[in-house]
Amino acid sequence: MRKSGRRLLALALLWPVLLVPSQAPARELLAVGAPFERVFEYQESGEYGGLGAELLRLMAARTGNTVRFRMVPWARAQAMLVQGQADILIGPYKTPERIASMGFSDKPFYQDQMVFYTRQDASFGWDGDYAVLKNRRVVLLNGWAYGAEWERVRPGLQVSVANNVENGLKMLVHNHVDVFVSNRRNTDPVIARLGYGRQVKPLPKVIEVQNGYFAFPRSPTFDKLRLQFDQELNNLIETGELKKLGKRYDVSVP
């Protein structure tokens, strides 16, 4: 009876443990990205900030993980994810090519307006007809996605590539190009920092609205992590927490 009682006691103590779902072991995740204004930034304190960084810290903590960050040029950040050298990419827009090589979060966490920037004294205007760009020099950013319609008309244009927003703006100001294509979130703060407010202007008509996501390596081994982060992001959306964070960082959220 004593042995039987001990067995029953041991089973009673073990029973709650058996009912708890197994948790994936904690991991230190590497999140990579390029400097994206108010989404992913390197701060003077030496910490990484922005809406994307804060969301990843929250979601990592709530899934029992930790996260560290690395900032590299955008084309390199994408390559690191695709090659399995990083666990999360911060902020990509969806394109058919990226969907084929990356696993995107179920929902976006921010939204951008893509526009044309010109010099203040330029007579160029845009009403949606891409034909007006045919004889104008255009600069794009390396590795950025501008939408399906833009990709359709791009082959017939005079296109240069810049590695960052600052270089693109300088090319415009110094008359190396006529039009700079970018988004307002990334570009307007740089215009202010460089003192270009009286030299360049965004055209009022929006080219396209793009949604920004988190992306993971397209591998079955990352499916569970992606689904966990999807659940946490959905919770942040449903509770209104994402909306509050968007206001704090001055980032548009869907």
Predicted regions and their residues:
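Bacterial N-terminal signal peptides
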Residues: 10-20
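Extracytoplasmic small-molecule ligand-binding "clamshell" domains
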Residues: 26-101, 161-162, 248
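Short loop->beta-strand "edge-of-pocket" segments that line small-molecule binding or catalytic clefts
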Residues: 28-42, 126-144
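Periplasmic-binding protein-like
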Residues: 34-36, 111-115, 192-230, 252-254
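Extended ligand-binding regions for polar small-molecule ligands
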Residues: 50-62, 122-124, 135-136, 144, ...
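Ligand-binding clefts/hinges and TM-proximal coupling segments of bilobed small-molecule sensing domains
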Residues: 66, 144-160, 198, 233-254
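Short helices/loops that flank or line small-molecule/ion binding pockets
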Residues: 75-87, 103-104, 166-185, 193-194
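A ligand-binding cleft/hinge motif common to bilobed small-molecule-binding domains
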Residues: 79, 91-100, 178-199, 204-208
